Amino acid sequence: MIIQINKIILRFSIISIFFISCKYTADSKKEIKNMYPHLAKYIDKVYSMSEKERKGLLLMVGIKDKILSEETIKILKENKIAGIILFDYNVVNEKQLKKLTSDLREYVNPNMLIAVDEEGGKVNRIHFDKLKNISPKNIGDKNDKEYVYKIAYQKSKFLLDLGINMILGPICDIPKDSNSYLYDRSFSTNINIVADMVEATVKAQRDAGIITVLKHFPGHGDTAVNSHDDFPIIDKKISELKNKEFVPFKRGIDAGAEMILTTHIKNKYIDDKLPVSLSKNYITILEKDMNFSGVIITDDLTMTGKIEKGINFGINLNSDIYQNIEYMFEDMKPDIISCAKVLKVISENDYLARKK
């Protein structure tokens, strides 16, 4: 959704991605640190943060700027926003894009997470990407692990050079057939090929130093409906999902993926009320059954299709960006562990330190 700020030319798109915040029963810092010893130092940092700083960690937004404006800087800084997602309208050329990402870190947050969808094929945000015409399907058709590693590594280095340190990919979905809206964006209809390509892609991305985001959990391939347009329902028992849809995600997790993006679909066998993007049941599956300890994020909350057919996400944005952020912040209750996990990813992927 595009939001006009105070009816001037500059525009903002607000709410791109929400980091899912889980609730834990441990009341004291000591108890929480004992539960999550690998997050201990980040838990200490979270306890020293203000409520606004914690909320800012858990929200990623899109901006309309090509050249970072003072107004955008003010909004992002005031609300302690830690994540930005870029789209094609943010991109003019290499020099301009490098300055935009550099300015975001210089004037807003030196540890800013800057993300992009740069899949290749149908989905590209950067028109001068030399690899943009190589789609996941092209890669899957070759079914060559060395080839996919090479492409993923080169693309990751290309993005990092532009100041982008987070890529929304690889796609782990397994399309049922050519009728799936993800058919051309996916590696293959074959489970093993998808899993192999995902594993090699994640290894390349991690070797290059970019943050990996597996998508779209729990698997969006077995539908002809785009969740950005409508509200798909895929009713499969968890045993079925484990034997198919979950396989590429598990391979990506084992290869070192740091984030997983959930989609807006519903499955009555796992949660008969909430979609994946809002359901704790799926988080439990990821953490307990699939041994994922990283950050779980949702797909775009302003692109949830015909929500009257599914669930009302409670998003009611207007023309004032300040009010919109206040609106989204109002009911956010960022828990310690969610914030600590994001801090861990930021710390382990310090863009400026690596650049030096």
Question: What positions do the PLM features span?
Answer:
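Sec-dependent signal peptide recognition
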Residues: N6-I15
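C-terminal motif of bacterial Sec signal peptides marking the signal peptidase cleavage site
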Residues: I20-S21
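N-terminal hydrophobic targeting/anchoring segments and the immediately downstream early-domain regions
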Residues: Y24-F128
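Second-shell residues forming the walls of enzyme active-site clefts
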Residues: S50-E51, Y89-E106, M112, K122-N124, ...
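Active-site mouth loops of central-metabolism enzymes
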Residues: L58-I67, P136-Y149, D230-K244, T302-T304, ...
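Short glycine-enriched loops at secondary-structure junctions
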Residues: I63-I67, V116-N124, N165-P175, L214-H220, ...
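Short, acidic/polar
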Residues: K64-K77, V148-F158, K242-P248
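A substrate-binding/cap region within the structured catalytic cores of diverse enzymes
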Residues: P136-V202, R206, E348-N349
